[in-house]
Curated annotation (Swiss-Prot):
Residues 108-356 form the NR LBD domain. Orphan nuclear receptor. Residues 7-82 bind DNA. Belongs to the nuclear hormone receptor family. It is found in: Nucleus. This is Nuclear hormone receptor family member nhr-42. Its main location: nucleus. One of its GO terms (molecular function) is zinc ion binding. It holds the Pfam family zf-C4. One of its GO terms (cellular component) is nucleus. It comes from the Eukaryota. Keywords: DNA-binding, Metal-binding, Nucleus, Receptor, Transcription, Transcription regulation, Zinc, Zinc-finger.
Length: 356
């Protein structure tokens, strides 16, 4: 006698469901979406009136409504967090090998990841306060003026909260400044891409966004009633927006980084050992730090991806750095073109903080 199978439907998007995930019947795509959002502790910025339709065709368009529906049908954040806690405990055991390592400590940790997680959490909390981000915050589509204001303010926050974590006594202030200059813009672009995963929007630290399908709005100036420059600028730079999506954002969509992986890459961006005017002492420290970061990353992947090929995952993550470098090459070209067309000010927060 053959058992007749009945098709099951994902309670979130209506696609075919394979089993219960985190307490609700869902497809793998919605389960992975929910896990990423909870595990990554990402702020889900709302840009709608909570009435978006969530189905197989529209599920990627509004993360906030999709997340709300996950919770509504019974998915539990605690189910994700408990699983992560077990993996994180295995990770700490493999590094330290002592139960005492789980206890909070007032001393500075030797772990790159733990120090970065603490610093990034403080950065995110400060951003909420500075940019007035609350649970009821509704994201707004912004133009170049708003973007420049946000990034000029946020760069100061990044320097205060994140870069302090990277400082090493073996590196002079002059060399620290060199590393900082080469870090800032790649980090801005990388973090924006990370927070905009699976979206056609580019999210800013303020929660506002740039709609990459309507870049005329980004280049528009509401103070100028006869603003013809917006269309001209959009025509000039549209190919570069598309190229950025192909080189970095699409790559990040494929890799689907979690928060620790994002932070490991952030550290690798900073400790670059191939910069012009970098002295031998700085190069040596950067090489040592890169080796330590890769070692921690490898240990992390071994313990989080127990039944998967962790070495392949490490390779995927390292390749993200190549995508960031290609994007930076494109940004340098964009800067030159902006000077020719006299639209440098439309990207001044980016161009003004780039290394020459």
């Amino acid at each position: 006698m053959t058992r007749q199978t009945t098709s099951q439907t994902c309670l979130i998007c209506g696609d075919s469901a394979d089993s219960l995930h985190f307490g609700a019947l869902s497809c793998r795509a919605c389960a992975a979406f929910f896990r990423r959002k909870v595990a990554g502790r990402r702020n889900i910025f709302r840009r709608c009136d909570r009435q978006c339709k969530v189905d197989t065709g529209m599920r990627k368009l509004c993360a906030s409504c999709r997340y709300d529906k996950c919770l509504k049908v019974g998915m539990r954040e605690s189910a994700v967090l408990s699983r992560l806690a077990k993996k994180n405990q295995n990770y700490k055991k493999s590094i330290v090998g002592s139960p005492d390592a789980y206890e909070p400590s007032t001393s500075t940790s030797d772990s790159v990841l733990e120090n970065l997680q603490s610093a990034y959490h403080k950065l995110e909390e400060t951003r909420k306060r500075v940019f007035n981000i609350s649970e009821t915050h509704v994201s707004q589509c912004c133009n170049y003026k708003r973007m420049n204001d946000v990034f000029f303010e946020d760069i100061k926050l990044v320097m205060e909260h994140l870069l302090e974590t990277f400082k090493k006594s073996d590196i002079s202030q002059e060399q620290e400044k060199l590393l900082c200059v080469h870090f800032m813009v790649p980090f801005i672009l990388f973090e924006g891409g990370y927070k905009s995963t699976n979206s056609d929007l580019f999210y800013l630290p303020s929660g506002d966004f740039i709609d990459e399908n309507r870049i005329e709005e980004y280049y528009s100036n509401p103070d100028d009633q006869n603003d013809n420059s917006a269309k001209s600028a959009a025509e000039v730079f549209r190919p570069y927006w598309k190229l950025n999506k192909q080189t970095l954002k699409t790559h990040l969509d494929d890799v689907q980084l979690d928060l620790p992986e994002f932070l490991f890459i952030t550290a690798l961006i900073y400790f670059d050992d191939g910069l012009l005017d970098q002295n031998e002492e700085c190069i040596e420290v950067c090489k040592q730090m890169k080796a330590k970061i890769i070692e921690e990353l490898t240990d992390y992947e071994k313990n989080v991806r127990i039944n998967e090929d962790h070495s392949y995952r490490v390779g995927q993550i390292i390749m993200v750095l190549h995508g960031i470098q290609r994007t930076m090459n494109m940004i340098h070209e964009t800067k030159e073109i902006s000077l020719v067309y006299n639209v440098y000010d439309m990207h001044s927060s980016i161009f003004g903080n780039m290394a020459e």
